[in-house]
Amino acid sequence: MKIVVPIMPTSLEEAQALELSRFEGADIIEWRADFLDKHSILTVAPAIFEKFAGFEIVFTIRTTREGGKIELTDGEYVTLIKDVAAIYSPDYIDFEYFTRKEVFDQMLEFSNLVLSYHNFEETPENLMELLSEMTNLTPRVVKVAVMPKNEQDVLDLMNFTRGFKAFNPEQEFVTMSMGKLGRLSRLAGDLVGSSWTFASLDNTSAPGQVALADMCRIREVLDAD
C-alpha cells in the first residue's frame, strides 16, 4: 500500500518553504493546486515539480463542486490540467469525473488519469453503480472518498472495493471512508484492494487522515512477517 501525502501551498513562498525531509516514508505527493488562485498555479508549478522530483506526483485541482477550494468553469479546468501536463508530465492527473463528465472526452489523451468521486455528505446508495461506471472506463486509478454515517457504510465501501478488485485485478482502486468513523478503511485498505492511503503532515486535506509518521508505523506493522 502506497502512502500519499497532500501538499497545499497557498503561495510560491509556501511551496519553496516545504521541507523535503518531512516527507520521509511517503511514496506519492498529491499537489492540491486548488489552494492557489487559478493565475498562480503555473507560477508555482516549477517549485513543486523540482522539489519533489524524487516522488511520484498526483496533480489535483479539487474544485468547490467536490469539496475543494477553487471555482472553475469546465474550460478553465481542462486548460489548467493540459497546461501543467504538457510542461511537467505529472505521474497522475486527478479528474473529477461525475462533475466534469461533459468534458471527459478531452481527457482521453491521458493514460494516467485518476478518475475521482468525492462526497463529503454521505455514502450514496448507488455507490456500486458509481464504481462500476468509472471502472468500465479503465483509467489508471479509480478513486472514491465518501462520508459514512454509520459503521455499515464503512464496511459496505470496503466490501465493494474488495469485490471490484476481485473482478478487475488489473485495475487500481483507491477508496476511503472519511472522518473518524471511516479511519479503518484508511488503515486496512490494502486488505480489500485499495492501493493507496492518504496521510498528512500539519494540515489534513480530508477528514480522518492519519499523520504520516503514524501511517508509516502502521504500514510497517502490517507488512511485517
From Swiss-Prot:
CDD domains: DHQase_I
Example of a GO MF term: 3-dehydroquinate dehydratase activity
Matches recorded under InterPro entries: Aldolase_TIM, DHquinase_I, Type-I_3-dehydroquinase
The reaction(s) this protein catalyses: 3-dehydroquinate = 3-dehydroshikimate + H2O
Active site per the UniProt annotation: 118 (proton donor/acceptor), 143 (schiff-base intermediate with substrate)
Residues noted as binding 3-dehydroquinate in the record, renumbered to the chain: 30-32, 62, 186, 205, 209
Keywords: Amino-acid biosynthesis, Aromatic amino acid biosynthesis, Lyase, Schiff base
Pathway named in the protein's UniProt entry: Metabolic intermediate biosynthesis; chorismate biosynthesis; chorismate from D-erythrose 4-phosphate and phosphoenolpyruvate: step 3/7
EC number: 4.2.1.10
EC class: lyase
Family: Belongs to the type-I 3-dehydroquinase family.
Subunit structure: Homodimer.
Role played: Involved in the third step of the chorismate pathway, which leads to the biosynthesis of aromatic amino acids. Catalyzes the cis-dehydration of 3-dehydroquinate (DHQ) and introduces the first double bond of the aromatic ring to yield 3-dehydroshikimate.
Protein name: 3-dehydroquinate dehydratase
Natural source organism: Streptococcus thermophilus (strain ATCC BAA-491 / LMD-9)
Gene name of this polypeptide: aroD
